């Protein structure tokens, strides 16, 4: 029998119900209501009332089935054009996306999303735009049975935080999983599986503890040279273990190190920009969210560093979330950083908003991640799309300061621009508020004058406050730029020594910037007093951009810092003692006493020199 309720209704609005009501009235009027009997052809007699009752009951049951079908069978969804964090996400069939603690990678025109399902399987979804996801078959399904040696992925085991990596030598895809026995978290092992295809199916290879270390929250990172490194929380989450994997990625080598010791980090997420490795982590608070942590290095097996400030405890690293709600990582925990294909330095923070009562129903937090400041910075967006990356890097770090050039100052922790409304504040990129400065050189290579381009007035320290004044020869209009290894500066007034300071060490929009004494009690230059010089690449494409993430950039800055500190501490040596030569008042020496040039008429790099027993700044 054809179910007309599943057939598209071609009638104008309202006509369908009108026609059905008329048909029902006709049906009722055509049937004798009593004293008439009908045979079903098999000798059974039915009254007209019974026939009517049966027909109506049948129609009601069919209608009920249709309603239930509509409620429980997913309906294909319209295409999604925005990413909305913290909500319920469905795939293209209308089913809830279940892929937690996972990863997204780009392969041959598609993004593949892997995640745990809490059903001893690893799900896999596919998309071309990171917004509309199609469910594929499980990448990894339960296999084997629970055995004493725990070498299985049988139903009932816990498989968490799946990550996959392609091995170019074997032409195989390898999956890494945090493996537990299903009853507790005491096993702390790694399961490794392998497949010929990125989407699977993956087959279990082994379950082990890396070199007999416990390993819980984990990830895999493949470097540009093809080497794979496994990161896992170890020593009951006290330290982070980094293990170099074998050439086929299937087993650990004995090359290992423990990083961030004592910091109690979990949920590791590792990615690389240039020569710099970044790690995003969380603290250990169970299913509850906490402030994200940031660490970095240029030697993956060496020392990992993080910045602190006086507002944070030593067990906390720098938080990569910059807006309100960042103290809980926007109610999420890190799981991966997605590289957006076809866009330079475009990354997405990928996090889980856990529901401990029903982990499978946990939600997702995906947000744009910027590295413009030289460090990962994640801001909150209610809804966004990939166009957010179009202007993300409009302001670029200046390699050099050109005399009288036009620049902006960006604060390190917030990745926000020094701006001016009624006072100096930190704001998002906004050409109507961001202050553009002419940075004007003086006779001291470390001191500059700052002229606001729009008003032509100069920044001056007036009774310890930041004021824009007409130009003068006052020392209070000179600003010393004290360089840091990462290219940031402590900007301090040449007269009173007070420096740019962020109120309350806040990273929020609208935070006040004021002058305060350098906070050097525990740190040479704390993070909340550091700014870097940027330029508007839309207006000044001729300016040269600094290579923030290269080894050479930091090495050159360290050299400049050494030169600056030496210059500030030494007295000019007597020229007669230099290089054993007879005194010549025109010869140019560097601060180490090495002969550089015969006279100042020769080209010299910026720096400090000794000429005729006197310091010369260029």
PLM feature spans:
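Carbohydrate-active catalytic/glycan-binding domains of CAZyme proteins
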Residues: 79-406, 434-438, 476-480, 534-548
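C-terminal outer-membrane/trafficking sorting elements
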Residues: 21-46, 50-53, 57, 562-618
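Lectin-like carbohydrate-binding module/patch detector with strong preference for beta-trefoil
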Residues: 396-549
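Residue-level signal for tight coil/turn positions that link beta-strands
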Residues: 101, 108-109, 168-170, 224-225, ...
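Intrinsically disordered, low-complexity repeat and linker tracts
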Residues: 77, 540-583
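Bacterial N-terminal signal peptides
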Residues: 59-71
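Coil residues (strongly favoring Ser/Thr
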Residues: 92, 430-431, 599
């Amino acid at each position: 029998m054809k179910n007309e309720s599943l057939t598209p209704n071609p009638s104008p609005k309202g006509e369908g119900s009108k026609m059905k009501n008329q048909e029902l009235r006709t049906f009722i009027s055509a049937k004798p209501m009593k004293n008439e009997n009908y045979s079903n052809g098999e000798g059974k007699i039915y009254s007209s009332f019974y026939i009517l009752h049966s027909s109506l009951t049948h129609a009601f049951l069919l209608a009920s089935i249709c309603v239930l079908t509509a409620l429980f069978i997913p309906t294909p969804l319209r295409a999604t054009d925005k990413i909305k964090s913290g909500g319920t996400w469905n795939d293209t069939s209308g089913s809830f996306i279940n892929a937690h603690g996972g990863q997204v990678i780009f392969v041959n025109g598609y993004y593949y999303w892997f995640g745990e399902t809490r059903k001893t399987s690893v799900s896999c979804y596919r998309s071309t735009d990171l917004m509309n996801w199609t469910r594929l078959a499980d990448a990894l399904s339960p296999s084997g049975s629970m055995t004493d040696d725990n070498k299985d992925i049988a139903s009932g085991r816990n498989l968490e935080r799946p990550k996959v990596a392609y091995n170019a030598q074997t032409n195989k895809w390898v999956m890494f999983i945090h493996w537990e026995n299903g009853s507790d978290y005491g096993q702390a092992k790694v399961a490794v599986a392998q497949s010929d295809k990125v989407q699977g199916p993956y087959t279990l290879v082994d379950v082990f503890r890396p070199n007999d270390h416990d390993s819980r929250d984990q990830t895999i990172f493949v470097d540009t040279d093809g080497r794979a490194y496994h990161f896992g929380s170890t020593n009951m989450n006290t330290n982070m273990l980094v293990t170099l994997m074998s050439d086929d990625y299937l087993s650990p080598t004995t090359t290992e190190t423990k990083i961030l010791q004592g910091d109690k980090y979990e949920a590791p997420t590792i990615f690389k920009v240039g020569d710099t490795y970044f790690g995003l982590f969380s603290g250990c608070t169970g299913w509850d969210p906490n402030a994200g942590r940031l660490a970095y290095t240029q030697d993956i097996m060496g020392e990992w560093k993080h910045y602190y400030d006086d507002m944070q405890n030593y067990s906390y690293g720098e938080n990569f979330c910059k807006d309100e709600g960042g103290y809980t990582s926007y109610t999420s925990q890190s799981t991966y950083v997605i590289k957006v294909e076809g866009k330079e330095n475009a990354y997405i923070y990928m996090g889980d908003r856990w529901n401990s009562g029903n982990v499978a129903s946990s939600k997702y937090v995906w947000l744009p991640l910027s590295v413009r400041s030289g460090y990962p910075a994640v801001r909150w967006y209610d809804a966004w799309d990939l166009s957010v990356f179009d202007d993300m890097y409009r302001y670029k770090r200046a390699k050099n300061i050109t005399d009288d050039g036009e620049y902006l100052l960006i604060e390190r922790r917030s990745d926000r621009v020094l701006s001016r409304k009624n006072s100096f504040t930190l704001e998002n990129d906004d050409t109507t508020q961001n202050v553009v400065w002419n940075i004007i050189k003086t006779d001291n290579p470390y001191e500059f004058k700052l002229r606001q381009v729009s008003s032509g007035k100069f920044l001056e320290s007036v009774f310890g406050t930041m004021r824009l004044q007409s130009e003068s020869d006052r020392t209070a209009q000179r600003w010393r730029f004290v360089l840091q290894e990462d290219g940031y500066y402590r900007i301090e007034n040449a007269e009173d020594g007070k420096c740019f300071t962020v109120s309350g060490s806040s990273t929020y929009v609208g935070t006040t910037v004021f002058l305060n004494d350098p906070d050097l009690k525990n740190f040479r230059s704390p993070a909340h007093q550091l700014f870097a010089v940027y330029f508007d690449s839309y207006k000044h494409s001729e300016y040269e951009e600094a290579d923030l993430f290269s080894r050479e950039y930091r090495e050159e800055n360290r050299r400049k810092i050494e030169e600056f500190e030496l210059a500030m501490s030494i007295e000019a040596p007597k020229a007669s003692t230099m290089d054993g030569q007879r005194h010549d008042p025109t010869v140019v020496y560097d601060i180490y006493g090495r002969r550089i040039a015969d006279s100042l008429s020769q080209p010299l790099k910026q720096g400090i020199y000794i000429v005729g027993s006197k310091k010369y700044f260029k």
